[in-house]
């Protein structure tokens, strides 16, 4: 797995990857009062990427699990604007997600559903970073294309580019991934989608909304579903998606997107035993994780000096809090990476090898009507 990161970063660049994950907690209402909620647990993962003593990228994911079924909700992804030109935030996001998903595969995952809600904002994880002048803030259209690019690399990464030659390769390959995008109020979504493997819809389209749709933090679906639950509504999933267009963030005048990527895996002993960065991350108590996460949100990143100071203080305090925990391994807490990608490799990159691609999507201005 370190190779994945190295091949995504321009030669000569050096990064440090930090990965914290919380212990599992019960999650009795992921699907409201539906029986589907039974036995689900959840844990959080925080990835932070440091370059030259300052954080340049971060991502938080919440993983819900039951048996061999996993739902990965990308809660937040953000940059500070202080990364060098040889480091693509899109590729960093891709590497974080592969690291997380491969870790779930080592746990025996057979079904992994990756989902996220994309809404354009100036900052998500790094306070005041929108003010530093170096941060490239995408508009709503640009953000949708940015996530399409990232998830398309994931889709290709988990799809065999050539037909398996033997039964063992067949067992170790994924079933065909399915990618979905729904943009409330936008009829022509096809212009955002790269190929026929993407579906202009939601992954869940049938049944009763309050029983079939999961509820995630800071997700407009959750607030609406809770209202329907209180009203004891029998609204269908199809009607839910139609009416969501006129509610809350979805009716603000900006484009927002609901993304889903469905992955299915065959398991083999070879993959489960494989020693890779899927083992990354320091497991910490859920309460300590929340305290650590909240601390990050209190540090300023409005200037380079502030960002460097905030990075140093956060890492120092975090290490002091976790290094005495049972089973702490520093190499799982921090991974140092040296970039290996050549400029020509990145420029002429073939999508069949998504690990080496690093593209930053530029925002496109909406046509004024």
Swiss-Prot record:
The UniProt annotation puts the region (Disordered) at 345-369
Q: Where does acetyl-CoA bind?
A: 117, 136-138, 146
**Which residues does the Swiss-Prot or TrEMBL record annotate as the active site?**
219
What chemistry does it catalyse, as a reaction equation? L-lysyl-[histone] + acetyl-CoA = N(6)-acetyl-L-lysyl-[histone] + CoA + H(+); L-lysyl-[protein] + acetyl-CoA = N(6)-acetyl-L-lysyl-[protein] + CoA + H(+)
Taken from the UniProt record, the cysteine pairs bridged by disulfide bonds within this chain are none
Q: One Pfam match, by short name?
A: HAT_KAT11
Question: GO molecular function terms here?
Answer: histone H3K56 acetyltransferase activity
- Compartment(s) where it occurs, according to its Swiss-Prot or TrEMBL record: Nucleus
Q: Keywords for this entry? A: Acetylation, DNA damage, Nucleus, Transcription, Transcription regulation, Transferase
Provide the family line: Belongs to the RTT109 family.
| Matching PANTHER family | ALTERED INHERITANCE OF MITOCHONDRIA PROTEIN 6, HISTONE ACETYLTRANSFERASE RTT109
In Swiss-Prot or TrEMBL terms, this protein is called Histone acetyltransferase rtt109
């Amino acid at each position: 797995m370190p190779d994945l990161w190295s091949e995504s970063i321009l030669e000569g660049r050096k990064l440090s990857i930090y990965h914290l994950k919380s212990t599992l907690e019960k999650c009795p209402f992921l699907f409201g009062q539906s029986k589907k909620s039974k036995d689900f647990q959840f844990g959080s993962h925080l990835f932070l990427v440091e370059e030259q003593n300052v954080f340049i990228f971060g991502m938080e994911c919440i993983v819900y699990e039951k048996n061999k079924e996993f739902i990965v909700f990308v809660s937040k992804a953000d940059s500070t604007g202080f990364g060098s030109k040889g480091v693509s935030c899109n590729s960093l996001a891709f590497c974080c997600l592969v690291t997380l998903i491969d870790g779930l595969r080592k746990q025996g995952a057979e079904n992994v559903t990756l989902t996220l809600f994309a809404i354009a904002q100036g900052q998500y994880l790094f306070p005041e970073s929108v003010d530093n002048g170096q941060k490239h803030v995408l508009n709503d259209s640009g953000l949708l294309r940015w996530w399409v690019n990232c998830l398309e690399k994931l889709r290709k990464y988990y799809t065999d580019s050539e037909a398996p030659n033997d039964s063992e390769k067949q067992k170790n390959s994924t079933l065909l991934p399915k990618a979905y995008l729904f943009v409330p109020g936008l009829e022509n979504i096809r212009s955002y989608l790269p190929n026929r493997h993407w579906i202009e819809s939601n992954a869940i389209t049938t049944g009763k909304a309050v029983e079939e749709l999961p509820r995630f933090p800071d997700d407009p679906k959750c607030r609406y579903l809770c209202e329907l639950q209180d009203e004891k509504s029998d609204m269908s999933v199809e009607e839910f998606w139609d009416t969501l267009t006129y509610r809350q963030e979805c009716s603000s005048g900006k484009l927002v997107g609901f993304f889903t990527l469905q992955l299915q895996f065959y398991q083999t002993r070879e993959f489960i035993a494989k020693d890779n960065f899927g083992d990354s991350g320091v497991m910490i108590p859920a309460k300590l994780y929340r305290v650590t996460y909240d601390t990050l949100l209190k540090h300023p990143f409005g200037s380079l000096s502030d960002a460097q100071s905030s990075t140093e203080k956060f890492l120092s305090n975090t290490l002091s809090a976790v290094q005495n925990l049972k089973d702490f391994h520093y190499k799982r807490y921090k991974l140092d990476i040296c970039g290996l990608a050549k400029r020509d490799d990145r420029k002429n990159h073939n999508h069949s090898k998504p690990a080496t691609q690093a593209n930053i999507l530029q925002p496109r201005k909406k046509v004024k009507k």
